[in-house]
C-alpha cells in the first residue's frame, strides 16, 4: 500500500474528525464548532449542527429549526437539545435538523452590526449548503426560527422579514426593545406594519417570557390583529423543583429565569415543542 504524504494524511484525519459527532450526550448526531466559508462574503461561519437519530438523505427533506443565541454569544445548544430530545421521545415533536449559528454577539441578528453579516451568512450562504449536504428542507412551512433573549428579538425580526423562509417563530424571553414604528428601537421590525395581512395569514408566533417582558410588542400585535401564542413562566418560586435550571446555582432560594435551559424546560418547554410540531406541515 502506498504511503500517503503527511499533509494529505493530516487533512484526511482532520476531515474525518470534523464529520463525526463530538458528544455522546445526545440521541442524535451533535456537531459543535463547524465552519463554512460563505460563497458571497468569504466570511468564516461558525455553527453547531444537530441531526436527528438515523438521519439519512434517503428520508429527506428534514424540517429545520434555526436557533439564535443571546447577546453574550453563549452556545446553549446542548441544553436546548436535551429538552427537544425529551419532547421527541415522548412523541410531542418529530425529527428536526437544528442549526445554532455562533459568534454574533451584540448584533441583534442584523447585517452591518458589530461588523458582522448574520443575515447574509446564515440565510443566503449557510442554509443553501445545509439543504445540499444534509437534506434540509427549503419549504418554509417546515422551517422555524427560534431564539433566546437577543436571539428572541432576532427571531421576531427574521420571522417577519423573511416570510419566504420561515412559517413559525418562537421567541424565548425577548426584552422590551421591539417596535414596528420606532426606527431608533433596538429591535426595529417595520415588517409587522408593512406586511400585516401576510403575517396574519402565514406566520405562527409563540412568545415565552421569563424575567423580561414584551408588553409593548404584544400590544402592537393586538392592535394589528396578528394572532400569537403567549406564555409567562410561573412567578412563584415554589413552582420550580430542586435542580431546575430556573433556580440560581449560587442561591437556589432565588429564581434565575433568564437562561435558555430554563426557557425550554418543564411543561412550558413541552408546549413550545408541541407548538412547533403543530405548525410544521410535514410531507406524508
Model-identified regions with their sequence ranges:
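Sec-dependent N-terminal signal peptides
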Residues: 3-13
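Sec/Tat signal peptide C-region and signal peptidase I cleavage site
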Residues: 15-19
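Non-catalytic cap/lid and distal C-terminal segments of serine-dependent acyl enzymes
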Residues: 20-284
Amino acid at each position: 500500500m502506498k504511503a500517503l504524504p503527511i499533509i494529505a494524511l493530516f487533512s484526511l484525519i482532520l476531515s474525518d474528525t470534523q464529520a463525526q459527532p463530538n458528544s455522546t450526550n445526545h440521541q442524535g448526531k451533535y456537531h459543535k464548532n463547524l465552519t463554512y466559508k460563505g460563497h458571497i462574503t468569504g466570511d468564516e461561519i461558525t455553527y453547531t449542527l444537530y441531526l436527528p437519530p438515523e438521519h439519512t438523505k434517503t428520508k429527506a427533506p428534514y424540517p429545520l429549526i434555526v436557533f439564535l443565541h443571546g447577546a453574550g454569544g453563549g452556545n446553549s445548544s446542548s441544553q436546548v437539545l436535551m429538552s427537544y430530545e425529551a419532547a421527541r421521545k415522548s412523541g410531542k415533536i418529530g425529527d428536526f435538523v437544528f442549526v445554532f449559528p455562533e459568534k454574533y454577539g451584540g448584533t441583534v441578528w442584523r447585517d452591518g452590526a458589530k461588523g458582522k453579516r448574520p443575515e447574509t451568512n446564515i440565510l443566503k450562504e449557510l442554509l443553501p449548503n445545509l439543504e445540499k449536504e444534509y437534506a434540509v428542507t427549503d419549504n418554509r412551512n417546515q422551517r422555524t426560527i427560534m431564539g433566546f433573549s437577543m436571539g428572541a428579538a432576532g427571531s421576531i425580526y427574521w420571522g417577519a422579514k423573511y416570510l419566504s423562509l420561515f412559517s413559525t417563530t418562537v421567541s424565548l424571553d425577548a426584552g422590551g426593545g421591539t417596535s414596528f414604528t420606532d426606527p431608533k428601537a433596538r429591535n426595529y421590525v417595520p415588517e409587522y406594519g408593512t406586511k400585516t395581512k401576510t403575517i396574519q395569514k402565514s406566520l405562527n408566533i409563540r412568545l415565552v417570557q421569563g424575567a423580561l417582558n414584551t408588553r409593548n410588542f404584544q400590544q402592537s400585535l393586538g392592535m394589528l390583529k396578528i394572532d400569537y401564542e403567549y406564555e409567562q413562566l410561573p412567578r412563584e418560586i415554589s413552582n420550580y423543583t430542586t435542580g431546575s435550571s430556573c433556580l440560581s446555582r449560587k442561591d437556589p432560594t432565588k429564581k434565575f429565569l433568564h437562561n435558555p435551559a430554563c426557557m425550554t424546560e418543564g411543561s412550558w418547554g413541552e408546549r413550545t415543542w408541541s407548538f412547533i410540531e403543530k405548525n410544521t406541515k410535514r410531507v406524508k
